[in-house]
Amino acid sequence: MNSLLASAVAGLSAGGAYAILGVCAVFTYRLVAVVNFTGAAIGAAGTFVMVTLYESGYPLAIGVPAGIAAGALVATWIGIVMTTWFAGASASTKAAVTAALLVGIIAVGLRLTGGQHPHSFPELVTGSAFRFAGVEVTRASLLTLAIAVVFTLVTEQFLARTRTGLQLRALSLRPMAAELIGIRVRLLALCVWAVVGAVTSFALMVIAPLRSPDFMSLSLLVVPALAAALIGAFTSFRAALIGGLMIGIIEGVASGLDTFSQYRGAIPFLVILAVLLWSQRGARWDEAR
Amino acid sequence: MKYLTSLLLTSATACCGLALMGGSAAAAPTCEDGPIQLGSVSTITGPVDFSDGPSGAKAVFDQLNAAGGINGCTIEYTMADDKGDPQVAAQAARDLIDNRNVVALGGGASLLECAVNAGTYKRNDVLSVQGVGVDPMCFNAPTIAPVNVGPYTLTTAMLDYASNELKNEKLCAFFIILGGTQEAYAQAVKRWEAMSGKTIHLVDMTLPLQGDLTPYLIKARDSGCDAVLTNQVEPGVVQMINTADAQKIEGIDWIFLASGYTEGVAKALPDTRQPVYLGTEWEPYTEVNAANGDWMAVMEKAGLAKTAFSQGGYLAAKVLVDTISSIDGPVTRETIKAKLTEGKPMKYSIAGSDYVFGDAAKHAPMQATKVMQLSGGKWVPRTTDWYVLPPVE
C-alpha cells in the first residue's frame, strides 16, 4: 500500500505538467476555438531559445524573458496562420491544421536543436520542497502546479469580470457577430495566442530539466495535455486542472504495478475514451429509450 | 629488385593489415568492370541522424582511392538513407543490389535496416559488414555481421561488470522496448544469469521512451537495487540521472549502454554525484591514444567529427578493404562472400575482439567493451583493459 502511495506521489510531477498544459489547451479552445496540438511544441521552442542563450553564456535573467518572448512570438505566428486562412473553418479543420503544424515544428525543431542530443537545461527552481511517502516532491513540480492553479483562477476571473473578457467570450462563441459589432477580433485572437505561448514556454522551462531533454519529447507532452483538456470537455478550466493531475497520478500508480505498467502509455487514451463514453451517455440512453 | 618488391609488400601489408588476414600477400584483386561498388543503408534523416557511421566508411574509401585504390581498383561507395522507415529501407537495399550492383554492404548504421533487409541480402547472396547494428536481426542473420558489440551483448557484459568489478549484489534492469527487442534483451539477461550462476533481482521492460521517470526510480530504490542497468538513449540518460538527483537517491550504480556515450550527455551532467558507468562499442572515442590513432588520422584528414558512430563506419570499411585486398582475381559478390565466410579472425586496434564473419547462422563477433565512468562532466576510462565476455555457447 505504501509503495502505491509512493508511486502516486511520484506521478505528481508529471501531473503538474499535464495540468498546466491542459489548462492552456482549454484556454485556446475557449477563446479562439482551436483544439491546439502545437501547445507543447510552442513551449518547447521558447524553452530551447532559453537553453541556447544559456549555453552560449547569457545569464538566466536574459535567457528566460527571451525564451518567453520567443514562445509568444511562435504562438503569434501560428495565430496569424490560423486567423488569416482558417478563421471561418470548422473546429475539426483547425485541429487538423495544428496537428500538421505540430509535425512541421517537431521536424524543424529536431534539426535546429541537434536531434536527440541532450542539452544542459538549467534548473530555474532547484531542490525539493518536502518529502512525502518516501518521495521528494520537487519545488519545480510545486511551481508548475501553482502556475496551473493561478492561471486557472486568473483566467476565470478575467473572463467573468472584465470587458475584454466579455469580448473574448463573444469572440469564441460568435466570431462573425463579434466582428460586426466592432470588436477587434484579430488583435484579440493574436493576444490570446501570445499569452498561451508565453505561459507554456515558462511552464516547460520549469518542467524540462526532469523530462527527456529533447525537442520531440517535450512537444509530445501535448497528448496527455489534450486528454486533460478533454476531461474538462474543453470548457472547464478546473476540470482540466484536476484531470491533468489525475492522469499523472494514475500513470505513477500504474508504473508501480507490474501488470499495468506496460500499458502506462495508453492511460491518456483510456481516459479520453472513458470521458467520451461518460459525456455521451445521455444521448445514447435517450436514443435507447 | 627483389629487395624493392619485398619492401613494397611490407609496406602494403603494414598499411592494409593484409598479414592479419592471413591471406596470401600476393593476392591481386581485379576489377574489369570499373570501380568496385559498395554501399550501405543508414538512418540519416528521420527520427535520428546516424550519418556519422557511413560518412566514416566513406572517408576510408575516399582516402584509399586518392592513394591509388587496391591494386589499381577504386571503390565507389553509395550511402543510402532509410529515413527510419522500413519501406524506404527495403527500397534502398533493392536499389543498391539491383541497380548499383554492389558487391557487399558495409559501414551502415540504422535503426531497423537489418530486420527489414536480412532476407533480401540472403536471397541475393550479398553480405553486410554492418557499422552499427541496433536491431536484434543484425546479430541473428547469416548475411550480417556487425563490427559493433551491440546493445544485447553489452547488456550481458555490463551486468557481468557490475556484479564482478563493481561488486553489486542486487542487479536491476529497466529496458525501453522498441519493435522486437524484448526477446533479445531477455536473452541477454539470461545469458548473464547462465554465465555467472546468479539471478537478476528485478527486470522491468516497461520503461517509457517519453514520460516521467520518477515512479521507476522510486521502484528501483524501494526494491533495494544496488545497480540499475538501462538501455536509455542520450536524452533519457540525462533525464534519469537528473531525476535520481532530484529524488536524492544514493547507493545505486547507474549503468548504461553505448547509446549514452556522448560528450553531450557528459556535458549535460557536470555536477551529478551519482555513480554513472557505461560500456563502449570500441576503444573510447574520447581518448587520444595509439589504438585510436589511425581512425583519428582518417577522420581529421576528411574533416569529420570524431564520434563513436564514425568508429563503426571506419572499422567496417577497414574490414571490407582488407577482405577485398586478400582476393586473388575479380572482386564479385561470390569472391567477397567466399573470403568473409572463411571466418579468419581480423584484428584491429580500436576493437577488443577479433572480427570474424564466418559461416554461422548468426554473428556477434564483438564481445569486448571498455567501461567509462562519468566524472566532473567528462567520460573517464575506468580501466585500460578490455572487458571481454567468454564466447557464446
Task: Set out the residue ranges of the language-model regions.
Chain B
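Short beta-strand segments enriched in small/hydrophobic residues
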Residues: 34-52, 108, 170-176
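Beta-alpha junction/loop-to-helix N-cap segments that form part of ligand/metal-binding clefts
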Residues: 28, 35, 49-58, 67-138, ...
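Extracellular/periplasmic periplasmic-binding protein-like sensory domains
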Residues: 244-314, 385-391
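Periplasmic-binding protein-like
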Residues: 96-109, 129-131, 170-175, 224-234, ...
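Short, low-complexity disordered leader/linker segments with a strong preference
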Residues: 1-37, 66, 391-393
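Extracellular/periplasmic Venus flytrap/periplasmic-binding protein
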Residues: 136, 143-248, 284-293
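Segments of small-molecule ligand-sensing domains
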Residues: 301-310, 322-379
